[in-house]
Design a protein with these regions (language model features):
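Alpha-helical scaffold domains
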Residues: 41-277
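Positively charged N-terminal leader segments that act as targeting/secretion signals
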Residues: 1-17, 21-37
Length: 277
């Protein structure tokens, strides 16, 4: 775990050691071993500084680190500092969450906001998703949303218990949409997209989404995603939003783009949508 946490530290220290000792053709032996000893002392001291403030949970999470994935995934969430991304693949973190949810420390972890690492936030969302009691689950979601700071954490699957309480959830969604907070708004639109586009659909729902005005990229992208999905599921009700250009120009174009890319939109519908670009 320590080596994983240190990452690129060892090569830096090792290169310094090599540069200082390799040219030493005369004073080999004692001098060289002394320098190696000092190098190891420096290295251990650095590791101690790096890890002394880590919680036990954070240490366990770093044991799951995949450095190549960390480098790749950090590019997908550019507003998060790479130093705050451990680099844990979602299936691995999901398996960890299932086991961790049964531990005594899980409940305490939910109270420890804000978190330091991106994966801690994702773990938090996974734990919330498993809460069966609707009132408790909603309470935890509302506690967490102010700390959500990226699209990936925001877009985690909706808690299962929400599907059984759609009428009760609607006023909360309206509050989310009116919050003025980027990821709270995005989360609310995501709920409407995932829970209210099938049997429980009502024309008022796309109207709620269309009424959201924002300059935030991640809000507007979610609005476009919502309408592209809505066109696939509720074409007759939602196509007027495109025909009458009720959406902002950017969202209008992005909605058409995403709908045309969707396998759920027919070829005939795609041809029609392209006429409104």
């Amino acid at each position: 775990m320590v080596i994983s946490r240190a990452g690129g530290i060892l090569p830096d220290f090792f290169m310094v050691f090599c540069q200082e000792t390799a040219p030493d053709r005369v004073n080999r032996g004692t001098s060289r071993y002394r320098r190696f000893f000092l190098f190891m002392v420096q290295f251990i001291q650095h590791i101690n500084r790096e890890t002394k403030d880590m919680t036990e949970l954070q240490r366990r999470l770093f044991e799951l680190q995949d450095k190549k994935y960390q480098a790749f995934h950090s590019k997908l969430i550019p507003n998060i500092e790479p130093a705050h991304v451990i680099g844990i693949r979602t299936p691995v973190l999901r398996n960890f969450a299932k086991a961790f949810a049964k531990e005594d420390g899980a409940e305490a972890f939910l109270q420890e906001l804000p978190h330091t690492y991106y994966e801690e936030n994702n773990l938090h969302m996974m734990l919330i998703g498993g809460i069966r009691d609707y009132a408790q689950c909603l309470y935890e979601v509302k506690r967490m949303l102010p700390y959500v700071d990226n699209w990936a954490t925001c877009d985690f699957p909706v808690p299962k218990c929400f599907a059984k309480h759609k009428e009760e959830l609607l006023p909360e969604i309206r509050t989310f949409l009116a919050s003025g907070e980027t990821y709270t708004i995005r989360y609310g639109i995501g709920l409407l997209m995932r829970l209210y586009l099938d049997a429980d659909f009502k024309p008022e729902y796309p109207a709620m989404v269309a009424a959201v005005t924002s300059e935030e990229y991640y809000v507007n992208m979610m609005i476009a995603w919502y309408f592209a999905t809505a066109l696939a599921k509720q074409w007759e009700t939602c196509i007027p939003y495109i025909e009458e250009r009720r959406l902002s120009p950017w969202v209008h174009r992005k909605t058409i783009q995403k709908a045309v890319e969707s396998y759920r939109i027919t070829d005939e519908q795609k041809v029609y949508l392209k006429t409104f670009r």
